[in-house]
């Protein structure tokens, strides 16, 4: 499909969208991750942006996309509770890859939130969901709107959790496309890419973390645990950022 046809697909009936997306995803399945990035930047409409949590394996997508479009906005939602190592990792990769970093935060500071609501992450699933809406979902919605993003690139992978096992390479979320170039990659694929381009893992990887977010809801992988159990005290895997937008 041409760029104009892809743009028109955003407003097509759902049945048409579904049929065309199935066809496009069959095509994309035959491409490498790098080829998917090239295709997406060339054909998918609107402003492009890449979201990143600067997690354990974040350097893969940050490198892969920025090597093709150096000025692509990189959206980070900063909760104010990231690990010190994460902030250092952000600085390291931003400098090394010359990233066009765009940081978005909740309108209310973390200290003010605690004064008003208490520690929401300790208030069960409902508290976690409220915390995530305040600190991740709303800032990301604002970022996508302010940057007028028509195509959203992200580094989700099916092997990361059961909630991601059925995600397609390309989807339509509301009024924009969402492209997941490394969706079927394994941890080995990630390691090979990082090694090939001499890219670092997040510093906490060496301390046993396989997934890292906020200090209060991330912990190292222990014997018998799955990756998704290392986040949010095992209560949930997703913060909502990729599912409520």
Swiss-Prot record:
SUPFAM superfamilies in the cross-refs: Adenine nucleotide alpha hydrolases-like
Localization per Swiss-Prot or TrEMBL: Cytoplasm
Pathway(s) served: Sulfur metabolism; hydrogen sulfide biosynthesis; sulfite from sulfate: step 3/3
Pfam families referenced in this protein's UniProt entry, alphabetically: PAPS_reduct
Active site feature: 239 (nucleophile)
GO biological process: hydrogen sulfide biosynthetic process; sulfate assimilation, phosphoadenylyl sulfate reduction by phosphoadenylyl-sulfate reductase (thioredoxin)
InterPro entries, per the entry: PAPS/APS_Rdtase, PAPS_reduct_dom, PAPS_reductase_CysH, Rossmann-like_a/b/a_fold
Presence of the UniProt keyword Cytoplasm in the record: yes
Gene Ontology cellular component terms for the protein in this record: cytoplasm
CDD domains cross-referenced by the UniProt entry: PAPS_reductase
Record Gene3D superfamilies: HUPs
Keyword Cytoplasm: yes
Enzyme class, broadest EC rank: oxidoreductase
Catalytic activity line of the entry: [thioredoxin]-disulfide + sulfite + adenosine 3',5'-bisphosphate + 2 H(+) = [thioredoxin]-dithiol + 3'-phosphoadenylyl sulfate
Enzyme Commission no: 1.8.4.8
Gene Ontology terms for molecular function: phosphoadenylyl-sulfate reductase (thioredoxin) activity
Keywords recorded for this protein, A-Z: Cytoplasm, Oxidoreductase
UniProt cross-references to NCBIfam families, sorted A to Z: cysH, PAPS_reductase, PRK02090.1
Family: Belongs to the PAPS reductase family. CysH subfamily.
Described function: Catalyzes the formation of sulfite from phosphoadenosine 5'-phosphosulfate (PAPS) using thioredoxin as an electron donor.
Protein name: Phosphoadenosine 5'-phosphosulfate reductase
């Amino acid at each position: 499909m041409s760029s104009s046809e892809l743009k028109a697909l955003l407003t097509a009936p759902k049945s048409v969208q579904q049929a065309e997306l199935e066809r496009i995803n069959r095509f994309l399945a035959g491409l490498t991750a790098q080829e998917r990035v090239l295709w997406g930047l060339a054909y998918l409409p609107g402003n492009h942006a890449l979201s990143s949590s600067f997690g354990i394996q974040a350097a893969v997508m940050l490198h892969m996309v920025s090597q093709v479009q150096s000025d692509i906005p990189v959206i980070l939602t900063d909760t104010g509770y990231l690990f010190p190592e994460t902030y250092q990792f952000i600085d390291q990769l931003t400098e090394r890859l010359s990233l066009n970093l765009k940081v978005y935060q909740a309108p209310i500071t973390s200290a003010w939130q605690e004064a008003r609501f208490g520690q929401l992450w300790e208030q069960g699933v409902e508290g976690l969901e409220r915390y995530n809406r305040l600190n991740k979902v709303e800032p990301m919605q604002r970022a996508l709107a302010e940057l007028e993003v028509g195509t959203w690139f992200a580094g989700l992978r099916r092997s990361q959790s059961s909630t991601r096992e059925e995600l397609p390479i390309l989807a339509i979320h509301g009024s924009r496309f969402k492209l997941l170039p490394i969706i079927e990659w394994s941890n080995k694929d990630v390691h090979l890419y990082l090694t090939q381009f001499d890219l670092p893992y997040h510093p906490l990887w060496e301390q046993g973390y396989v997934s890292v977010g906020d200090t209060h809801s991330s912990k190292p992988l222990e014997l018998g645990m799955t990756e998704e159990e290392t986040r949010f005290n095992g209560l949930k895997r997703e913060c909502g950022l990729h599912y409520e937008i």
